[in-house]
């Protein structure tokens, strides 16, 4: 999913460079995002192909890190615009009233706040490296609870519920199927089997499966579907507990008179062309 970034900067954390820090429309828009490389690439292409090349910078963060910044910094955050898990945006808006009402129409089946427009919907799935499954004579899991089996110990990668929204998909499915207490017990054993492969990034389990470092992971379904279609030794299982989904949305920071008007225009561009 990663591509060379010729005109934008993506950093793992820290402060953005080239921020707008003012209302002039000639200043670059600072975009904070928790999105994976593939989604960022789509947003970049939308902006670059519609007149906004060299007018923005992207700064990447883990979900929990960016969520913490939104809650702690509110309107004082350096970003002009964010793309983020919708439930985090809702929490930040409820606490800080920090987002502008979007000034363009947003057509959705579900109801969203007038400050956020969904850009992606993501589902979780069990991912497998079929070559490694055969090599180590591992049976294919059919449900999330199967990931607690001892045969998978050392062959499993998972995301950390403290840092990745992808782990939220796993946790919600477990709670729905087994209740909160049993879900915690199941998750604890899954983490034991994952060992050193409890990852911060939602795409990390797939990347590890793709690289042949682990045989099984829990990650984003659409990424596994794409890898399988491209002929990689990747397959996926929709767990019997169900596929939960979450949305990622775009929002514009309300900086009052210092709000850069390009932020709304770029948000609309991402929605219409991303």
Protein language model features and the residues they cover:
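Short, low-complexity disordered leader/linker segments with a strong preference
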Residues: 1-29
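Loop/turn elements at helix/coil->beta-strand transitions in domains of secreted/extracellular proteins
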Residues: 27-28, 52-54, 77-80, 152-156, ...
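Extracytoplasmic ligand-binding site segments that recognize negatively charged/polar headgroups
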Residues: 33-41, 61-64, 78-210
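Short amphipathic alpha-helical coupling segments at ligand-binding clamshell hinges
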Residues: 42-43, 182, 186, 248, ...
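Short alpha-helix C-terminal cap/hinge motif
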Residues: 42-57
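A ligand-binding cleft/hinge motif common to bilobed small-molecule-binding domains
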Residues: 87-92, 210, 215-233
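Periplasmic-binding protein-like
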Residues: 109-110, 186-191, 198-199, 230-254
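A bilobed periplasmic-binding-protein/Venus flytrap-type ligand-binding module shared by bacterial periplasmic
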Residues: 127-132, 172, 247-259
């Amino acid at each position: 999913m990663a591509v060379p970034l010729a005109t934008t900067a993506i950093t793992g954390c820290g402060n953005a460079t080239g921020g707008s820090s003012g209302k002039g429309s000639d200043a670059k828009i600072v975009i904070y995002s928790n999105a994976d490389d593939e989604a960022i690439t789509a947003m970049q292409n939308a902006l670059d192909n519609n007149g906004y090349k060299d007018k923005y910078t992207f700064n990447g963060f883990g979900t929990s890190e960016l969520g913490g910044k939104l809650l702690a910094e509110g309107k004082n955050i350096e970003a002009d615009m964010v793309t983020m898990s919708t439930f985090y945006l809702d929490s930040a808006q409820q606490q800080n009233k920090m987002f502008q009402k979007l000034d363009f129409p947003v057509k959705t089946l579900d109801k969203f706040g007038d400050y956020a427009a969904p850009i992606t919907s993501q589902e979780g799935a069990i991912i497998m490296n079929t070559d490694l499954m055969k090599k180590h004579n591992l049976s294919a899991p059919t449900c999330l609870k199967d990931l607690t089996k001892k045969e998978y110990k050392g062959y499993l990668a998972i995301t950390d519920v403290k840092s990745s929204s992808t782990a939220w998909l796993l946790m919600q499915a477990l709670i729905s199927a087994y209740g909160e207490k049993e879900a915690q017990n199941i998750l604890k054993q899954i983490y034991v089997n994952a060992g050193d492969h409890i990852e911060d990034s939602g795409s990390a389990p797939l990347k590890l499966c793709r690289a042949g470092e682990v045989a099984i992971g829990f990650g984003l379904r659409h990424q596994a579907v794409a890898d399988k279609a491209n002929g990689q030794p990747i397959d996926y299982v929709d767990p019997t507990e169900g596929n939960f989904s979450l949305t990622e949305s775009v929002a514009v920071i309300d900086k009052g008179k210092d709000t850069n008007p390009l932020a709304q225009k770029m948000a609309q561009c991402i929605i219409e062309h991303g």
